[in-house]
């Protein structure tokens, strides 16, 4: 054991602060001043801001005390005597070397490896206040990987840079049931990470952090089971997000500000069902929010089927509004504090009273309880004459106008009887198609969308009656006053009564000429459609989209992006109402512009795919390229083209694409980032690339859809893409989780992607040209060096021959050369010649 005494050295720099003095190791804070305000008590996550400071001797201080490099005599550094009270271990040339134990002034200790007088390698450093670090040291500084242990028992294990938590690591607090695992930057939570606020793991946050603050995108699960998924700012919900209150069966999706609903959003109240029953709707509000209240303009859909659209003030209907009752009657007028101000006009349906003036009559009607009750019964539909009941009352006014007035009553009665006889089967069909592509529903009810309705029409072969789906949309749009921009929208929802109304309208449009001379005509039209189309074919799903449950769920993640592509390439229809539609010709041009039409997918194959389920496309002789395609036909055609263009599983593209969803923090650690549609993305948007690749290999056409748009360019530039990955360049490809699977989805609109890809190809071409020029220069330089070596070798051999001829060597060892580089041989031979000349 070697003990060093304290000495005052005049040569030491008095102004230099001792690098290992207690002031270099301040006490570590135990409380988190930025504890979440809403998620836990102020002491719930305090210890996560513990920031270990630099504990070791600085390298630059050591260099000041080292002697001159040219001095061969090593002297013990002066500062060591002042800093280290005692040392046990080995020394080399006066410097600590190997394993040792040192006690510093102030009570700090170190046991571990030394190198050239510095703590270097594995070791354990304990501060005077009890904080301990076990791990790697690099020149007196904790680096790479280590474990911090605080006096209260809290621990951190993970990456360390400059004595601070930096990189990936896990922190556990001993005083509170709080733990964090994720990325750190300069001692603070920064990047992707998960924090758990209780021992059971039922209260947690997983997502983005910026300097100990939840900021970005993340998921917060509360102890009650309520879940928020969306954007954060300054530790509160802020931006776009979805909140689900499982305790009260509510859900809100929309904009947030400072932790409360603010802006546009949708709030849904899910009703508890009576056993063996279903509600067709849940209560839902779609509109503006201010500080958590319904405030501004909005729509409220009641579970009964009624709807209010108008102004709101602090959760109450206030101002001008339009209230549609469940039987279809409408009140349009002012509201005050959730009540109608003016009395609704029932157009003569209200009983008249003997008062001469309408004003007096109105006042009597408003005041008399019996009249008011009767009016409300009429408004609520309790006195409906429909055989189907008020909840399924059909709107037949437009169809009945096609018949003489004397026949209208009989036509209505007979068609209602027909619906009533088939209502069980029609309800089953509605429920079946409305649930396609839906993963879950809190109240086990589903709403049919236009996308489902199109699939129903195609399965039942409505389009085989010389009418396309686009034509059907126009017929229904004209009959029901649908806005032009929503005529072909796949997201429009249909209630059961709307579904029944549409069937009757299409039945009349398709068969009315056949039964125009027979009565009841409307009943016969519906009966034929039911017997020949609906009953034999319904619920037998065809097409690429809804034929497999797993494929459907996977493909539905592309609907929004493909809808953008579809609308971008639509053109106004020549005939009224001049809505945007896509013809088969424009579809083919779009594919050609994306370089998808190739040897695998020819124009002939394109026609065959479109004509598979569309008799209007090809009659055996001619092809109809003016055929209009609705979005369902467009989307299913893309899925079919994906099978043709990408026959093999696209897993090989995974390694070729740079992952844009990986962000690098200051420490160089990589973590996934998810930006997402809060409605369509799974709560756990962070998944490993390896598991995603394995999952994607099980997909068929849906997993190939994302690379379809630029598949031909990918195949041509695959080596270039690999090179760009090695150079750190990135392409616009998102890896997002959908059912825990890997999805290739272009982050740009498809009509813009070609320009981006052209720029990327141009950049790769310039890069390859530069690399080729560099390789050429390297080859020329290498060739010149080889020629020089050959010349030296030839000269050396000639020189050896000359030496041998002039004089034989005195002894054998001098004439035998061991294999070594040519230059060394020349030097050895020249030295031997010189020595021989001196002997002479």
UniProtKB/Swiss-Prot annotation:
Residues 1-74, 810-840 are annotated as: Disordered. MORN repeats lie at residues 86-108, 109-131, 132-154, 155-177, 179-201, 204-226, 227-249, 251-273, 284-306, 307-329. It is found in: Cytoplasm, Cytoskeleton, Cilium axoneme; Cell projection, Cilium; Cell projection, Cilium, Flagellum. It holds the Pfam family MORN. Residues 758-801 form a coiled coil. Residues 1-16, 51-63 have a biased composition (Basic and acidic residues). Keywords: Cell projection, Cilium, Coiled coil, Cytoplasm, Cytoskeleton, Flagellum, Repeat. Gene3D superfamilies: Histone H3 K4-specific methyltransferase SET7/9 N-terminal domain (2.20.110.10). GO terms for cellular component: 9+2 motile cilium; cilium; cytoplasm; cytoskeleton; sperm flagellum. It comes from the Eukaryota. May function as part of the axonemal radial spoke complex 3 (RS3). Radial spoke complexes are important for ciliary motility. Interacts with RSPH6A. Does not appear to be part of the axonemal radial spoke complexes 1 or 2. This is Radial spoke head 10 homolog B.
